[in-house]
Regions:
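Regulatory N- and C-terminal appendages and interdomain linkers associated
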Residues: 1-12, 20, 40-45, 312-376
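ATP-binding glycine-rich loop module of kinase domains
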Residues: 11, 17-46, 91-98
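Active-site acidic catalytic loop and adjacent metal/ATP-binding pocket
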Residues: 13-28, 32, 185-231
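AlphaC helix (C-helix) of the protein kinase catalytic domain N-lobe
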Residues: 45, 49-52, 59, 236
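Conserved HxN/HPN-centered segment at the entrance to the catalytic loop
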Residues: 53-68
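ATP-dependent phospho-/nucleotidyl transfer catalytic cores
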Residues: 88-111, 119-203
């Protein structure tokens, strides 16, 4: 009989982001090593994991090793494999498939969130809230400056007009309705929009379909801590409705190689967009498209989690105003508009116009039923 190999077997690296993940198999454990090039981000991840494990199911962190130029975090490896193991895979179910597993998952996930949020919620000054995805990006030298400080982005194929700077004067039409949209004014407003106290709770902070495992567990902890509740809602909702099913796999297909069913679902989640200038004003028409699985997940999230949170912490129409800056940052602070195709750029611009409208309505924005949404 051949003796078992006493040495661990290290698999080919998986690259979902700029940090590489290496599967490791030993005689007793299935592990995954996360190699992080930023020591500060690694430190934040360790602290976030320590905080989260008291409230949420998370894989065990077994080791932390610091080497020159890298910090390596070694976690328990969850059963993530080809087209299975993530919420993403439940959302990739075809429209004629069975969505009962997704429905049960969403009920358990929202129940966990609701318990933790009501136990840990407090009105917090901005300095105590994780700032990576929102406040830090709005600060001088942050992502808004990096993306837009020197760009006046064209809105048609013609390079002369119209451009973003023209919108303060002309506005634009979205599906036949005129919207005022001052681009520079919006950026200026966002720079100070995260400097006031907010309702916050303990969370992972970046609740996307690739950061939620099946069976239920939370992954990726560098934004874990005390996060704005409105930011949490904006992140999950916009990622589920727009980014996760269409824009992210379109722009970063390498991250989805282990989940190829994602690509089959892109057509079902790709909006239709058309635009033309008329009398100096841009007219954009769009139609949202969303698979049944993603629509179900969004509906359950709002009915089972957002509605009770809104009733408790954002009564009346307060949720709309609380969401507005976080949603605006999700729209223009994830991808640089200048690097997108014209169709992608115009679609996000319509979403920004709807978000910044005086009568902004999450119900209309996410095409929710009235029973799913607590606001007008």
């Amino acid at each position: 009989m051949r003796p078992s190999n006493p040495f661990p077997r290290i698999g080919a690296p998986l690259k979902f982001s700029r940090n590489r993940l290496y599967p490791i198999d030993t005689r007793r454990r299935r592990l995954i090593a996360k190699c992080m090039t930023d020591h500060n981000e690694a430190r934040a991840e360790v602290l976030g994991h320590q905080l989260l494990r008291d409230w949420y199911p998370v894989p065990t962190l077994h080791h932390r090793v610091r080497i020159p130029g890298r910090t390596v975090l070694i976690y328990e490896r969850l059963p993530v494999d080809t087209d299975r193991g993530l919420l993403l895979d439940l959302l990739n179910t075809t429209d004629d498939g069975d969505h009962s597993t997704l429905d049960a998952y969403m009920r358990r996930m929202t129940s966990t969130y609701l318990h933790v949020f009501t136990e840990t919620a407090e009105l917090s000054p901005p300095s105590t809230v994780v700032g990576k995805l929102y406040r830090d990006r709005a600060l001088p030298g942050g992502r808004l400056d990096h993306y837009y400080a020197h760009n006046d982005i064209p809105l048609t194929q013609a390079q002369d007009r119209p451009r973003l700077s023209d919108l303060a004067r002309t506005g634009l039409y979205v599906n036949g309705r005129h919207h005022q949209l001052d681009w520079d004014g919006t950026l200026s407003w966002l720079r100070g929009a995260f400097d006031t106290p907010v309702w916050s709770a303990i969370s992972q902070g970046d609740p996307t379909d690739v950061n939620l495992a099946v069976p239920l567990a939370w992954l990726d902890y560098d934004t874990a801590g005390r996060n704005a509740i409105a930011g949490e809602i904006a992140n999950f909702s916009f990622y589920t409705a727009v980014l996760g099913g269409w824009l992210v796999p379109t722009l970063n297909p390498q991250a989805f190689i282990q989940h190829p069913a994602t690509f089959d679902q892109i057509p079902a989640n790709t909006p239709r967009v058309s635009a033309h200038p008329h009398a100096g004003t841009l007219h954009i028409r769009f139609t949202d498209r969303l698979s049944q699985a993603r629509r179900l997940a969004l509906s359950r999230y709002w009915a089972l989690l957002v509605s009770p949170l809104a009733a408790r912490y954002f009564p009346g129409g307060a949720l709309s105003e609380a969401l507005r800056p976080y949603l605006a940052m999700r729209i223009i602070g994830v991808f640089d508009l200048v690097r997108l195709s014209l169709e992608q750029r115009l679609y996000l611009l319509t979403k920004l116009a709807l978000c910044m409208a005086p009568d902004f309505s999450p119900t209309r924005f996410f095409d929710l039923t009235e029973s799913s949404c607590p606001t007008r």
